[in-house]
């Protein structure tokens, strides 16, 4: 396996481990999720460049759109929780239900 791909997979794995370790804080979880999305974006971009297929050229852009939507929703939840409770614990998400 090419060392570039191994480094990107290592970045994804480290972000996944960070997500599992810091799952009680929303800010740390969002940062780890962004790291995972960026490593997936780089991986799909490299695959699209190597295959040179017109069908795979749109995949990194679609992934980037979903990452931006995920970041916007995550930051909205973070602002809502921090304004309401002053903390960024994920267990406060259950308290936001009507």
Curated annotation (Swiss-Prot):
Location (main, coarse): mitochondrion
Effect of residue 94 to S: In strain: Isolate 704
Domain of life: Eukaryota
Record flagged with keyword Electron transport: yes
Reactions it catalyzes: a ubiquinone + NADH + 5 H(+)(in) = a ubiquinol + NAD(+) + 4 H(+)(out)
GO CC, any one term: respiratory chain complex I
UniProt similarity note: Belongs to the complex I subunit 4L family.
Gene of this entry: MT-ND4L
Record's keyword terms, sorted: Electron transport, Membrane, Mitochondrion, Mitochondrion inner membrane, NAD, Respiratory chain, Translocase, Transmembrane, Transmembrane helix, Transport, Ubiquinone
Functional summary from the UniProt entry: Core subunit of the mitochondrial membrane respiratory chain NADH dehydrogenase (Complex I) which catalyzes electron transfer from NADH through the respiratory chain, using ubiquinone as an electron acceptor. Part of the enzyme membrane arm which is embedded in the lipid bilayer and involved in proton translocation.
GO aspect biological process, one term: ATP synthesis coupled electron transport
Transmembrane segments: 1-21, 29-49, 61-81
Subunit structure: Core subunit of respiratory chain NADH dehydrogenase (Complex I) which is composed of 45 different subunits.
A GO molecular-function annotation: NADH dehydrogenase (ubiquinone) activity
Localisation per UniProt entry: Mitochondrion inner membrane
Protein name: NADH-ubiquinone oxidoreductase chain 4L
EC numbers: 7.1.1.2
Pfam families named in the record: Oxidored_q2
Coiled-coil ranges per UniProt: none
Effect of residue 9 to V: In strain: Isolate 704
Recorded topology in the membrane: Multi-pass membrane protein
């Amino acid at each position: 396996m090419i060392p570039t791909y191994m480094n990107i997979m290592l970045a994804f794995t480290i972000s996944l481990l960070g997500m599992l370790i810091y799952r009680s804080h929303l800010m740390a979880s969002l940062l780890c999720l962004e790291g995972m999305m960026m490593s997936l974006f780089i991986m799909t971009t490299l695959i699209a460049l190597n295959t040179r297929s017109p069908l795979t050229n749109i995949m990194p852009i679609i992934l980037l759109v979903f990452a931006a939507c995920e970041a916007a929703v995550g930051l909205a939840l973070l602002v809502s929780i921090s304004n309401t409770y002053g903390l960024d614990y994920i267990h406060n998400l259950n308290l936001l239900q009507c």
